[in-house]
Regions:
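Conserved glycine-rich Rossmann-like NAD(P)H-binding loop of the short-chain dehydrogenase/reductase
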Residues: 26-42
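C-terminal helical subdomain
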Residues: 179, 198-236
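Active-site helix of classical SDR
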Residues: 116, 153
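The beta1-alpha1 cofactor-binding region of Rossmann-like NAD(H)/NADP(H)-dependent oxidoreductases
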Residues: 56-66, 98
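Substrate-binding pocket helix/loop in short-chain dehydrogenase/reductase
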Residues: 92-93, 100-102
Length: 260
């Protein structure tokens, strides 16, 4: 399918914006969703004529439904839905408040759930589609303790994604479900974390947004269930869970992840 319609949340910056631009270069139709309207429209302008910006807060179910409605009204279909919106935190487990925990679940898990539940009936009616949930290496290995509730949220997102895949596997084999797990990416993720944090763009060895988005683009073209933004990350996860004491392998963390 060469003329895909791709919905990307969290598309005003970072991985989402970079993926939108790559998708535009492929000639695909792109629906970009985010809260920040000026930045979103700037990205849409770079994507080109086949871009549809939708200002929305994906932690609100009605806003997510509005994204789908806008996509269908403009393009008539959706082929790929990328749940990319998210936010980090810089607090230890012992410091978390109810509000902190709820915010991490709302932004990182509920937003993806709303996306899944909005687009899934459309995919089921067509018998095909692709849902991609952007998770994190921190959803597999707790390299950074101060990410606490963010790590927990990404673990929850991974479980939600895996369960959805099993739910659809037999009856809807052409609806693909992907967990995408990047490590440290050179975005404003760190400075935008709840409680602040180190600028991810200044961490040596951080993966560029262009490279990370390129891996995501390949996932869209060649759907797989579980994809890491760098191939060596999979071995790091295997090594962690193979350890009897669940010790993080020395020197095995993605670049910069041992730092807050």
């Amino acid at each position: 399918m060469d003329n895909k319609v791709v919905v990307i949340t969290g598309a005003s910056s970072g991985i989402g914006a970079a993926l939108a631009e790559l998708a535009g270069k492929k000639g695909w139709k792109v629906v970009l969703a985010a809260r920040r309207e000026p930045e979103l429209r700037q990205v849409a302008a770079r994507v080109g004529a086949e871009a549809l910006p939708v200002v929305a807060d994906v932690s609100r179910r009605e806003d997510v439904q509005r994204i789908l409605d806008a996509a269908l009204a403009r393009f008539g279909q959706v082929d790929v839905w990328v749940n990319n919106a998210g936010r980090g935190i810089s607090k230890l487990v012992s410091q978390l408040t109810d509000e902190d925990f709820d915010e991490m679940m709302r932004v990182n898990v509920k937003s993806a759930l709303y996306g899944i539940q909005a687009v899934l009936p459309h995919f089921q009616s067509r018998g095909r589609g692709h849902i991609i949930n952007v998770s994190s290496m921190l959803g597999r290995v707790p390299y950074v303790p101060v990410r606490s509730a963010y790590n927990a949220a990404k673990h929850a997102l991974n479980a939600l994604t895996a369960n959805l895949r099993q739910e659809l596997r037999e009856r809807y084999p052409d609806i693909h479900v992907t967990t995408f797990l990047p490590g440290v990416v050179a975005t404003d993720f760190g400075v935008n974390a709840l409680g602040g944090g180190m600028d991810s763009r200044k961490i040596p060895g951080a993966q560029s947004v262009e490279e990370t988005a390129g891996v995501l683009l390949d996932v869209i073209e060649r759907p797989r269930p579980d994809v890491y933004s760098r191939p060596e990350y999979r071995q790091q996860v295997i090594a962690y869970y193979a350890s009897e004491d669940l010790a993080i392998p020395e020197g095995g963390a993605p670049p910069g992840t041992r730092r807050p």
